[in-house]
A protein has these predicted regions:
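Segments of small-molecule ligand-sensing domains
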Residues: 180, 216-286
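Extracellular/periplasmic periplasmic-binding protein-like sensory domains
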Residues: 37, 117-122, 142-146, 160-234
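An alpha-beta-alpha
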Residues: 39-98
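Second-shell loop/turn segments in exported
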Residues: 36-42, 62-70, 94-97, 134-137, ...
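Periplasmic-binding protein-like
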Residues: 1-5, 23-25, 64-68, 116-153, ...
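Short beta-strand elements at the ligand-binding edges of bilobed clamshell
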Residues: 31-54, 191-203
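Short beta-strand elements in bilobed, periplasmic/extracellular small-molecule ligand-binding domains
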Residues: 34-37, 85-122
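Beta-alpha junction/loop-to-helix N-cap segments that form part of ligand/metal-binding clefts
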Residues: 1-31
Length: 287
């Protein structure tokens, strides 16, 4: 059985104690380890965990998360910080960003400072925006060397210049972004403005399967968010056909359209994403 897609329906299936093999297309808050159940989701948390691994692999020590206020930001911060800790990393800092309108108005201000509050000690009710006085430089003994941004294409079009305005374009901080900022709409000016930024993308949209990419984008009228779901459907079929291996063979890996797929002991499917970089007006592989 493939599905369901909604978290509450996944929880209902778990309560039913079905004997069928189930590939749930979402991950509930509390995962249960059952021999007939795997969880496969395209979620911001999933992407944040992959970002933590990628940034850690690049030798970064002190990441700053630039994320939206509200539930989405909370989910990203929690997932990234948990994974960073598992990797042996130290302090993760966060700064909350306002709406597109607030970012736009910030163009006439002082830009975005690369400072933040430690994730572990900041209550979720305390949000900061555009480098407010509540942000502290760093308490971990080192300076910020990476910033992970979760924003739409329009928002990141303001965020990156605002960072450069405040910190200088030659700052030593490497900027990373989630696929939320990549919707296939970037023209040459945008690509030049984003120079040096690395972002995660599913392999299909990074060029690993050009035929399926063309088929998917044609089917969804070039909507990248829907194309990612299209790729998820293709991967769900592959996972269902390799359910026993994913569930029972530690280290088993499928090269999927949404990532290189492996399973945790609870059979939560992890995705290793492709990372791309804007370089001299082009998009090239970052890893």
């Amino acid at each position: 059985m493939v599905g369901p897609l909604l978290k509450e329906n996944v929880e209902e299936v778990m309560k039913s104690n079905t004997s069928l093999n189930v590939l749930a297309l979402n991950q509930p808050g509390k995962v249960e380890n059952r021999p007939n159940l795997c969880y496969f989701a395209l979620s911001p948390e999933d992407e944040a965990r992959d970002a933590a691994r990628h940034i850690h692999n690049q030798g970064k020590q002190t990441p700053l998360l630039l994320v939206p206020r509200g539930a989405l930001g909370d989910r990203v911060v929690s997932a990234f910080a948990d994974e960073w800790l598992k990797l042996g990393g130290g302090t993760v800092l966060q700064q909350r960003l306002g709406s597109t309108a607030e970012l736009k108005s910030g163009v006439n201000g002082g830009g975005i400072s690369l400072t933040g509050s430690p994730v572990s000690t900041l209550p979720s009710s305390v949000d900061s925006s555009l480098g407010s006085p509540g942000d502290v430089p760093v308490s971990s003994g080192g300076s910020i060397d990476a910033a992970y941004i979760v924003a739409t294409p329009e928002q990141i079009g303001y965020i990156k210049p605002l960072i450069a305005m405040r910190n200088g374009s030659q700052s030593n901080v490497t900027l990373y972004a989630s696929s939320r900022s990549a919707q296939g709409t970037s023209g040459p000016d945008f690509r030049l403005e984003m120079e040096g930024l690395q972002y995660s993308e599913i392999p299909m949209l990074a060029g690993s399967n050009p035929a399926l990419m063309q088929q998917a984008l044609s089917a969804v009228r070039n909507d990248y968010s829907l194309a990612r779901l299209y790729a998820m459907g293709a991967d769900a079929w592959s996972l269902a056909n390799h359910f026993a291996q994913m569930r029972q063979s530690p280290g088993y890996e499928l090269n999927g359209n949404t990532g290189d797929l492996t399973a945790t002991p609870d059979c939560v499917i992890n995705r290793k994403l492709s990372w791309l970089k804007y370089q001299q007006g082009q998009i090239v592989a970052a890893n």
